[in-house]
Amino acid sequence: MIEPALALVSFGKLDPAITAGAVSESTNTLTFSWDGGRYVYDDRAMFLVYDIENGVAEFDTSATKRLFKKGTFTLTKNFSGREVHVYLAFVSEDRKNRSNSQYLGKNTVL
């Protein structure tokens, strides 16, 4: 069995965020926020949402620029009402460098 809190979905040398979180504020979306860690102006955030019970995941490998410190992930499948495991990572614009992923915990999607 997979232990979601121990799983790495990204591995690399870019700095992770110092603080990070995710909340579901509207139907079928998660809003990610983060702060801290060194970065280059065009580094991007990567979002991953995993519904372990149904074996379904969705991700965006270049969601928004890291410097914005916030981004909304609209899910393409109906995750409404489901409990999901949430991960955040960062990637350089040229995709050559990544951070280790950070497990942000479980969320119930509105």
Where are these regions (language model features)?
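N-terminal "mature-chain" segments and other terminal, solvent-exposed stretches
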Residues: 1-26
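Extracellular fibronectin type III
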Residues: 2-5, 94-110
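Conserved aromatic anchor
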Residues: 26-40
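An aromatic-rich alpha-helical recognition segment common to small helix-rich domains
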Residues: 32-34, 47, 88
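Solvent-exposed loop/turn segments flanking beta-strands in beta-repeat/beta-sandwich domains
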Residues: 37-54, 82-84
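Surface-exposed loop/edge segments in extracytoplasmic proteins
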Residues: 53-62
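Short, solvent-exposed loop/turn segments in extracellular or other extracytoplasmic domains
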Residues: 64-71
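Beta-strand-rich modules
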Residues: 73-100
